[in-house]
Amino acid sequence: MRLPTRLKAFLFASLSLVVALTLSFGVAEGIVRLKNASMRDYNTEMWRYGRELKLPSADPRLGHEHIANSHAVLQSVNIRTNNWGLRGGPVSDAPAPGTRRILMLGSSIALGWGVDEDKVVSSFLEKKFEADGQHVEVLNGGVGNYNAERYVERFLTRLAPLQPTDLLILAFVRDGEELTRDSGNILLRNSQLALTAWVAATRVMAKASDGLVEHYKRVYAPGSPSLALMQAELGKLAKYAREHDIRVTLAMVPDVHVDLTRYPLGFVHEVFAQAARDNGFAYVDLLPAFQGLRPEDIWAMPGDPHPNARGHALMADAIYGVLAQAREAKGTR
């Protein structure tokens, strides 16, 4: 049976359109990937981080975890994980007798996104202890896109067997935000072109929404669900630390993509300072270490407001004195 001429024309036109769109998408995808091969696009490199070094967690509270014993070159920096999913080389399951072991918790800033392994806070601290004649292990437990709930639960359920003598929380203003697991649709998981379009749309919507300060005022408002969850998680961590004789230091990292000379998020720092007081943690506000610096002085690269190696060195300088005093006051176990 022969198809009517009009139907044949319609089917041919539809098929031609599908082929043309597919070819156009393929060409555009290739152009975007070629452009991003320089590893200078922050959003694309974060997307690759999620694909190459993360996997969904069986624990919904964690959302995702690092793939153990893996590595990837992201933003022109090699990031490797050991069998615990920590950034860096192999570590023993437990510290040697009498050895101080500091485990750093946090998100991508603690991880050292965009910074070589030997120039992140954990590495600088180890070198400082060594220069003072002390053998101290500083382990890097940072994971990108983690909040307080995620890094506390990861420690309690995954990393506690490492038996740290100290915990160093490298906290950030986003740590009180509630996060949900979102693996994205098939296009966002596999297409850099789709990612680029999604980022552009997100930026347009962000400009139309409330500003950054108003957002964080809602997150940290007294009685807000997000604040209550963060406080509960830090309280849970404090209880475990007391029961296991672990010293905890909370170092508050400022948001370095805003004006540091007229820093508008001091109220968030006070929330974390109060949480530290409530839980018996030592507290270090890292804002003074960054004041007077311009974004281009401390950003990992243009468009990426993570602290660079200089920023990590400044943070380590500010934190080291507190950690050294903690040892003198209590000694190692």
Language-model regions: role of each:
Residues K8, I169-Q274, F281, L286-D297, ...:
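Serine-dependent acyl-ester chemistry module
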Residues F12-E29:
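Hydrophobic membrane-insertion alpha-helices, especially the h-region
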Residues A72-L74, N78, S92-P97, R101-L103, ...:
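Conserved SGNH/GDSL esterase-like catalytic core that processes O-acyl groups on lipids
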